[in-house]
Each structure stands twice: as C-alpha cells, then as structure tokens.
Amino acid sequence: MPDRVRIFDTTLRDGEQTPGVSLTVEEKVEIARKLDEFGVDTIEAGFPVASEGEFEAVRAIAGEELDAEICGLARCVKGDIDAAIDADVDCVHVFIATSDIHLRYKLEMSREEALERAIEGVEYASDHGVTVEFSAEDATRTDRDYLLEVYKATVEAGADRVNVPDTVGVMTPPEMYRLTAEVVDAVDVPVSVHCHNDFGMAVANSLAAVEAGAEQVHVTVNGIGERAGNASLEQVVMALKALYDIELDVRTEMLVELSRLVERLTGVVVPPNTPIVGENAFAHESGIHSHGVIKKAETYEPIRPEDVGHRRRIVLGKHAGRHAIKKKLEEMGIEVTEEQLDEIVRRVKELGDKGKRVTEDDLEAIARDVVGEVPESEAAVKLEEIAVMTGNKFTPTASVRVYLDGEEHEAASTGVGSVDAAIRALREAIEELGMDVELKEYRLEAITGGTDALAEVTVRLEDEDGNVTTARGAAEDIVMASVKAFVRGVNRLARRRRD
C-alpha cells in the first residue's frame, strides 16, 4: 500500500457528463479554483475537442496558474491530442477502449488495431512534452492478458501513468484488488483507478485498488457522473485519511463548502443521508444516540464534523430524549426546571407522533409557552414593513422599517437579487443595535408543490462575538420566508447578548 495517494478530480469532465448538467466557462473556472484551494493533485478540466466552449473552459482553467496539474481528455486521435495541447494543459489523459464488446460494437476494430492506436496516441502526446496518462476504457471487462499487454506497450511508448477504469462499475473489491495488483506488478509507473458506481461500490473498489498498490484515485465531488456516478471525492478522501492513515495534501475542512458549491452550480442535489457532506451526516435524533453524542461525540461519530467543515445537529422528534432537548434549550439560552423540561419533552414527542417535523421554532414556541418567558412579540427586532422592487432592467432594491427595542428605524439596500437586497437592508438596520450579523449559510426548500408552494428557508447566522444560531422561516413568498428566518435568528442572537 502506498504512503501517499494522488487525488485526480474529474468533476469538470466526467462529473459534467451527469445527465442534465452543463456548466459555463465561468462556473467551471470557479469550481477549479475551489478544487485547487482544497488541494487536489490533478484537475481534469474537460474534453477540449468536444466543443468550442469546452476548449475555452479548459484553456481558461489552464491559464489560472493553479497549483494543481491541469489535465485534458483526448482519444488516441491526433486531433483530440492537438486540442488538449493547444489548451495549454499540463497533462493529456489519452484513452481507447480495449474490451471486446467495445472493440466490436463501438470502435469496429481488432485488438491489434486498438493496441497500435494506443501506442501512437501515447507517443504523439509524449512527444509534446506533457505528462501523459493512459486509460484502457472498460479495462475491467477486457481480456486480462491483452489488457496487460496494452499497459506495458503504452508505458514503453512514454505513458507516465496508467489508469484502470471500471467503466460500468462491475467489479467487486476483491476482484478490483487482484486486477490492480496485476497491473502494478506489470508496469513501472504509477497506477491509477477510475471507478463507477453502478452497483454502489465505486468507493469500496477505489480503496481496494489502493490496498493493492494504486497511487492515484479518480474522483468527483459528490460522486456525480454518468448513470449512477463516480467514486465520491469526499468519501474516498476521508476513508483514506481516517481509516488508512494515508497522507493526502488536502484541506478536509473545505469538503462541505466544496460539496455545496458543486451542488449549487450543477443543480444535482446531495441527498441528506450522503456520507461526510449530507445534511444528516452528523445529525442525531434517537435519545440514546444524542445522549451519547452530547456526553462524548465519538460514541456515535467516526470523525469530527468540523474536520470536514460540517456541524453536529441534534434533531428533535418523537425519538428525541431529555438530554438532547435540554442541550438544544441551553443553546437557545432558555433555562428550565426539571418539571418544565418534562412537559416540554412530552409536547415535543406528541408533535412527533403526529408526523410533524419539530423545528427549533417549534421547540422555542413550546418552551416559551411552558416557561412563560418573554413572547416573540417583545423581541429586540420587530419587522414592521418591507418593500422589494425587482425587474429585468434595474437592480433589486429593498427598504425596511423595523422596531429595534421599541424604536422605529428605516434602512434600504440593493443586492444581486430580491433576497440579497432584503437581507442587506435588515443587516444595515440592526447595526443600530450594535450588532454585526453575517449570513453563513442559506438553504431553501419548497414544502408543498405548485407555483404557490410554501417555501421554507433555513439560515445560519454568526455575530461579531462568534455566536452562531440557526433559524427558519416559512411563507408562500421566498423573500418573506427569508426575512422571517433572518429576523428570528437575529432575535436569538440578541437574546444571548442580553443574557
């Protein structure tokens, strides 16, 4: 097993082949910058010959002078390789299919012809002075003796790395281990693997390959890619670090940030139960689990959420226990007696039994009712009026009128959209309270269907003292849902300051 593994990210090439995904040049550059900041070794920027826009995107990324090696994909065809070279990449990833099914039905050529084409492609790319990585497409369904012959020949032709693609995800970890070990023994250059997730084993197969000596793994952010996707960058990286103790020069605390960026730009939603970066990756509802996590996080968490840029959440519902609810109340700054806590727990479970998702706002409302503390109507910030103007020919503008500790104040601001303008106006208004509140996270989801859907907005806010809170707002208007969430969050932070 190698001491260090290279991370070859193909989000911008194979990941963009996800059905329905198409990124602009600017979006691809933005993702490339973030990948470089994260620390991947290679960024496969695209397939330069595919289109003019793809060529421009690859060339733009190559011109960013990033620390990562910039790679372009090319068939073993001179025109493809020329396009990659013209895009000024550091590395050309050349490939040709080698399985009999691909040779017969797609390429319509013999094994001998494919071998000759592979050698010519590698030699041509190598003669241009770039790093050359060679892939035998559909390697895992290729005759083993022929596959090894192809790899040996391409290394002799000048390949700096060889890649073993499990193109349709048919391998099991033991089989992937055996194949990778054979390739490692056959060549004297680093071996890479590229695993697809058709049977849900892309990550497991990638790790098995590393155990067998592979020194590089192809991955995509959030595991996006054709069909069922590719090996997930975040899962492979954290497994290598946490389970194998293998050296990686990456900033794991950026994983969630990177995941959210790709989710936003591609429109491919990350399921909440996704390992490492999913919304529920560090969420606990069961009373037994949440009790354990509150006392000692390692009881039910294999890694720390902050190590990947995530946060721990104690979720309220019918499975929630006293310790979890008490901890949540403490975070809200609400002190309760044991008797009051019993009643709050009873009401929370009652809501959960009715199938209701118990939010922080629900818990706060229940607690205020039980404890009899200051009602929300007497909060530090009360929104009296908001007006937002937007259109296709002028900048979105928002004006607000609020009461701050009973005194009326007005503010206005512009923004990149209606929500941004409204939040900026509110931030300007609350400066009168001596508060500087930053919006750290924003999430929108439609609770119901249709154009009049009820929207729920979740915001995470942080004040100048580092206090953090999460608040939600729901309304049929996205701007109003956002404003409600922001005002509720500010009031929670203000209450903590007073306490």
UniProtKB/Swiss-Prot annotation:
Binding site for a divalent metal cation: 14, 194, 196, 230
Domain Pyruvate carboxyltransferase: from-to ranges: 5-256
InterPro entries: 2-IPM_HCS-like, 2-isopropylmalate_synth_dimer, AIPM/Hcit_synth_CS, Aldolase_TIM, LEU1_arch, LeuA/HCS_post-cat, LeuA_allosteric_dom_sf, PYR_CT
Pathway named in the protein's UniProt entry: Amino-acid biosynthesis; L-leucine biosynthesis; L-leucine from 3-methyl-2-oxobutanoate: step 1/4
One GO term of the biological process aspect: coenzyme B biosynthetic process
Entries under SUPFAM superfamilies matching the protein: 2-isopropylmalate synthase LeuA, allosteric (dimerisation) domain (SSF110921), Aldolase (SSF51569)
UniProt keyword terms in alphabetical order: Amino-acid biosynthesis, Branched-chain amino acid biosynthesis, Leucine biosynthesis, Metal-binding, Transferase
Coiled coil (residue ranges): none
GO molecular function: 2-isopropylmalate synthase activity; metal ion binding
Required cofactor(s): a divalent metal cation
Catalytic activity annotation: 3-methyl-2-oxobutanoate + acetyl-CoA + H2O = (2S)-2-isopropylmalate + CoA + H(+)
tRNA processing is among the record's keywords: no
Enzyme Commission number(s): 2.3.3.13
Pfam families in alphabetical order: HCS_D2 (PF22617), HMGL-like (PF00682), LeuA_dimer (PF08502)
Keyword Amino-acid biosynthesis found: yes
Family assignment from sequence similarity: Belongs to the alpha-IPM synthase/homocitrate synthase family.
PANTHER family: 2-ISOPROPYLMALATE SYNTHASE 1, CHLOROPLASTIC-RELATED, HOMOCITRATE SYNTHASE-RELATED
Stated role: Catalyzes the condensation of the acetyl group of acetyl-CoA with 3-methyl-2-oxobutanoate (2-oxoisovalerate) to form 3-carboxy-3-hydroxy-4-methylpentanoate (2-isopropylmalate).
Subunit structure: Homodimer.
Protein known as: Probable 2-isopropylmalate synthase
Source organism: Methanopyrus kandleri (strain AV19 / DSM 6324 / JCM 9639 / NBRC 100938)
